[in-house]
Regions:
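Conserved beta-strand signature within the Rossmann-like core of class I S-adenosyl-L-methionine
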Residues: 177-193
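Rossmann-like AdoMet
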Residues: 1-79, 85-131, 148-149, 300-304
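Substrate-binding/catalytic lobe of Class I Rossmann-like enzymes that use SAM or dcSAM, i.e.
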Residues: 203-289
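A conserved beta-strand element that flanks and buttresses the S-adenosyl-L-methionine
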Residues: 155-156
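Conserved SAM/SAH-binding loop
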Residues: 132-139
Length: 310
């Protein structure tokens, strides 16, 4: 198993301690601990939450012959925020069946997630090099993109863009792309009735709680809550914010360091954007300067996936 390290474990441990001190935990930390990674892998298989997206990827995989022709039989696949890599492998399996050679570069901040993605691809005899990097960093994105020569197939799936500032993130991704590259990217479509309810799903709560448990904060120590906000920079941008509120005085243990939390204090947790379809298209075309070649709405209407070029 080959993994190139841009974001070291020492760096992320220091950043995590600083984030706890600041009472704000960004996305990358939620997959860092092995327990969190295991809970995410289980959550990604939840048919109620991600079954529709899996059906979308089966549709994308059915179009593998067209991608194979575009890439002339050799496809470097660079997956930003790859997670456990299951959707990537579904497409790469279809590309291999068309006679394509796939070179796989999963990119993630989590060592545990990278190991899952790399091991899964190795089992399918796909040449793989994992890249441990922070995909919110434009410098790290460019480094990862340069792992292969154009044309390349970039992937950002599972509403990964929505876990960052999407206006900035799509620009960073577009800056990595050349004219013959392709990008498969999705966004979660906001729904008044279901978007918040999905966050309150027991499986989703279990995943979020895994990070807190990894630093010694248990279910009886406080409560996880959700807020919905609107991003006024453009119509149709909905921001769903998670937080933990301590119900008693307690402490979190990070790399042997005790960080106290007083009763009533809140820790901001990873946020997620959801969009109207028009807002998602606006992000890709107006903010990213990308051309949408094809759209794939998921059967459950939760996700909209787009195939793009620069």
């Amino acid at each position: 198993m080959k993994v190139e390290v841009v974001l070291t474990e020492a760096d992320i441990a220091q950043e995590f301690a600083e984030a706890i001190e600041a009472r704000d935990l960004p996305e990358k930390f939620f997959f860092w601990f092995p327990r969190s990674a295991a809970e995410w892998a289980a959550l990604a298989e939840n048919a109620e939450l991600y079954g529709g997206l899996f059906e979308t990827w089966k549709e994308i995989a059915a179009g593998a012959p067209g991608l194979c022709r575009h890439f002339a039989g050799r496809v470097p696949v660079i997956s930003f925020g790859a997670g456990e890599g299951s959707r990537d492998r579904l497409l790469m399996g279809a590309l291999k069946d068309c006679g394509c050679e796939c070179l796989y570069f999963p990119v993630d901040a989590s060592q545990a997630m990278l190991e899952m993605a790399c091991a899964g691809a190795d089992d399918e005899d796909i040449e793989t090099v994992g890249i441990k990097a922070d995909i919110s960093s434009p410098v790290h994105l460019v480094y990862a993109a340069d792992a292969a020569e154009p044309p390349r197939l970039f992937i950002m799936s599972g509403n990964t863009m929505g876990s960052f500032d999407p206006l900035a993130e799509i620009r960073y991704i577009a800056q990595c792309m050349k004219p013959d590259d392709r990008l498969i990217i999705d966004g979660e479509i906001y729904d008044d009735k279901t978007s918040m309810a999905r966050r309150d799903n027991p499986s989703a709560r279990k995943f979020v709680s895994a990070l807190l448990a990894s630093v010694g904060i248990g279910a009886s120590d406080g409560d996880i809550g959700f807020n919905l906000k609107r991003d006024d920079r453009h119509q149709g941008l909905h921001l769903i914010v998670r937080y933990f509120r301590a119900e008693r005085d307690l402490s979190a243990t990070v790399a042997g360091q005790e960080i106290p939390l007083e009763r009533g204090e809140r820790i901001g947790m990873n946020f997620q954007y959801a969009y109207t379809p028009d807002a998602f298209r606006w992000l890709l075309s107006e903010q990213g300067g990308l051309e949408i070649l094809k759209e794939y709405p998921s059967p459950d209407a939760r996700f909209l996936t787009a195939l793009c070029q620069k």
